[in-house]
Amino acid sequence: MSASSPDQRLDHLLSAVESEFQKGSEKGDASERDIKLSLEDAELWTKFKELTNEMIVTKTGRRMFPVLRASVTGLDPNAMYSVLLDFVAADNNRWKYVNGEWVPGGKPEPQSPSCVYIHPDSPNFGAHWMKAPVSFSKVKLSNKLNGGGQIMLNSLHKYEPRIHIVKVGGIQKMISSQSFPETQFIAVTAYQNEEITALKIKHNPFAKAFLDAKERSDHKEVPDHSTDNQQSGYSQLGGWFLPSNGPMGPSSSPPQFNGAPVHSSGSYCERYSSLRNHRAAPYPSHYSHRSTTTNNYMDNSSGSLASHDSWSALQIPNSSGMGTLAHTTNTTSNTSQYPSLWSVAGTTLTPSGSASGSITGGLTSQFLRGSSMSYSGLTSSLPVSSPSSMYDPGLSEVGVGDAQFESSIARLTASWAPVAQSY
């Protein structure tokens, strides 16, 4: 009996110690009695609180702004904890936005099933949670029960977030739970208060795109008065779009003259973006500006033609029976390598270095026939030394009248063959 009595006394002591340990764990460890949660960005949250904060809820979920962040102190650095977040109703009202303010609008809907968001870093050591503010930047608010870490909320109801800290690694127990009144918000499917929208755009770096888009739309409404200066760098000849500093070639789409924006491809999309929205008339009226038509045509044509590295001079075979259309201009500062002289042979024009009628340099007969400009600077006569099928037999001399020049040139250009570009 003397041997059994010590064993009985030992069992009694062990059970008493275990009981005391359990009671101590329920009361909390001494190192966890001073746990504190403090809200980060409290000043910003207060600004939203004064305007009645709103949070967007969508079917797929929308992240919160401001982001809920809190600093934790008083945890055991070597113990394991999980941090959770849930949302509770802040009142028993359904809200509506009337005349610029939120007012109660009836009884609330039944509360949705309680959804708890577990921080993705959970579980972790107390040292981890205390080294930096705990951020709930990935939580998403939804108006549908989708799961996947989303919190379901009823639209037009006011909520208040709560942060919970649970100790894990043994017997799980809640050691802290705290909410912050300044983080209350009304769940909405679209912002109702414009001041809330402006405040979120101002402070949310991910909302700057909305502000930039608004500024771009405002700039588009301002008329562009520099169209005349921009127009001087472009020339429209028939179906051709000729930039002043690029290779000559047809445009990717035919020119539009109905005021619609021009959408060109390639490198011209950004360089000539201003031409899309404010496009001036491609040609001046030769009836109202007849005195300056010749000079304008030469200025535009010489400015639009590409440099010698992308387009060589026109190669037209010489012939003894050749009539010349001498065109002169008063501009002496023009340094273009293409003189204002068009030579028309007495026989059929044949492209040099290629088959007849082929297009080698991207230049078609539209370049010669596309312009409707009047040639007031042409010489007074066109001597023709030999008859040709290209000329009207009755055309031996052309007067200085503008109407005669226009009708004669129309008959001449109708029989011109395509001129090929050779290198």
Curated annotation (Swiss-Prot):
Recorded phenotype for the gene knockout or disruption: Loss of notochord cells and posterior structures. Disrupts left-right development.
Pfam family, one: T-box
Keywords: Activator, Developmental protein, DNA-binding, Nucleus, Transcription, Transcription regulation, Wnt signaling pathway
Subcellular location: Nucleus
Tissues in which the protein is found: First expressed at the dorsal side of the blastula embryo. Expressed in the germ ring, shield and chordamesoderm during gastrulation and is restricted to the notochord and tailbud during somitogenesis (at protein level).
Main location: nucleus
Bias (Polar residues): 290-304
Conditions for induction: By mesoderm-inducing factor activin A.
A GO molecular function held by the record: sequence-specific DNA binding
InterPro entries from the UniProt entry: p53-like_TF_DNA-bd_sf, T-box_DNA-bd, T-box_sf, TF_Brachyury, TF_T-box, TF_T-box_CS
UniProt-annotated stretches for the region Disordered: 215-234, 280-304
GO cellular component assignments: chromatin; nucleus
Domain of life where this protein originates: Eukaryota
PANTHER family xrefs: T-BOX PROTEIN-RELATED, T-BOX TRANSCRIPTION FACTOR T-A
Subunit details: Monomer. Binds DNA as a monomer.
Protein name per the record: T-box transcription factor T-A
Lineage: Eukaryota, Metazoa, Chordata, Craniata, Vertebrata
